[in-house]
């Protein structure tokens, strides 16, 4: 994957979805139409954070390279150089996957 030349604004985060595997335990192949939307993603780029009421920048908690759980229907899907990414607000990130 070539890193896209894009910088999210404000409290937005650019992520690359981690597609679930096509074959599950037991060798069952899942057709594309039956797959659920992936909820795991890798953080590609982060914005500078949002401003509070005093104009002070609140930094984003995730960083580039973090593996995260995201809201199932949050964000906006974008294609950059033929690859699919998602831009979402920090609030659409549910958790950081550690380990």
Swiss-Prot record:
SMART domains: Cpn10. It is found in: Cytoplasm. InterPro entries: Chaperonin_GroES (IPR020818), Chaperonin_GroES_sf (IPR037124), Chaprnonin_Cpn10_CS (IPR018369), GroES-like_sf (IPR011032). Keywords: Chaperone, Cytoplasm. Pfam families: Cpn10. Coiled coil: none annotated. It comes from the Bacteria. One of its GO terms (biological process) is chaperone cofactor-dependent protein refolding. Belongs to the GroES chaperonin family. HAMAP family: CH10. Heptamer of 7 subunits arranged in a ring. Interacts with the chaperonin GroEL. This is Co-chaperonin GroES. It comes from Methylacidiphilum infernorum (isolate V4).
């Amino acid at each position: 994957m070539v890193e896209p030349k894009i910088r999210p604004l404000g409290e937005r985060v650019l992520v690359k979805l981690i597609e679930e595997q096509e074959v599950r335990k037991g060798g069952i192949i899942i057709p594309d139409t039956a797959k659920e939307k992936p909820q795991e993603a890798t953080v590609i780029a982060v914005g500078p954070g949002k401003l509070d009421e005093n104009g002070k920048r609140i930094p984003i908690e995730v960083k580039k390279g973090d593996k995260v759980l995201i809201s199932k229907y949050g964000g906006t899907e974008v294609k950059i150089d033929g690859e699919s990414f998602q831009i979402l607000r920090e609030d659409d990130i549910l958790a950081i996957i550690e380990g």
